[in-house]
Design a protein with these regions (language model features):
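Short, basic/aromatic beta-hairpin or loop at an interaction surface
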Residues: 50-61
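C-terminal boundary/linker segments immediately following FHA domains
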Residues: 62-90
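N-terminal beta-hairpin/loop module of FHA
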Residues: 1-35
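Structural recognition of beta-strand segments within beta-rich domains
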Residues: 20-23, 51, 80
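Short, conserved secondary-structure segments in the cores of folded domains
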Residues: 11, 17, 32, 51-53, ...
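Generic beta-strand structural signal
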Residues: 14-15, 45, 90
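Buried hydrophobic-core signal for structured, non-transmembrane domains
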Residues: 41-43
Length: 90
């Protein structure tokens, strides 16, 4: 669920397989922000785990204030991409 950012606040996105996140209109989750790369990150379902992977973005991806490359998401984790903050719910 997006909890802050320029738009889509309150919008949720189910993770079914792989969810692409970025500025490009080809992503499942589109974040319109100059700090967001065109292909910024993806969330992948592996078994019972959701894995957040930064796709070598220009400005990085943070989970709970820590910059990550790959991270197993837990309920209530806060994901920051550009000026957008999302909260992971399982």
């Amino acid at each position: 669920t997006i909890i802050s950012g320029a738009e889509n606040v309150g919008k949720s996105f189910p993770v079914d397989g792989t969810v692409s996140v970025g500025r490009s209109h080809t992503n499942k989750v589109i974040l319109k922000d100059s700090k967001v790369s065109r292909q910024h990150a993806e969330i992948t379902l592996r078994g019972n785990e959701c894995i957040l992977i930064d796709l070598n973005s220009s400005n990085g991806t943070q989970v709970n204030g820590q910059k990550i490359h790959e991270h197993i998401l837990s309920p209530n984790d806060e994901i920051q991409i550009g000026d957008f903050v999302m909260q992971f719910q399982k």
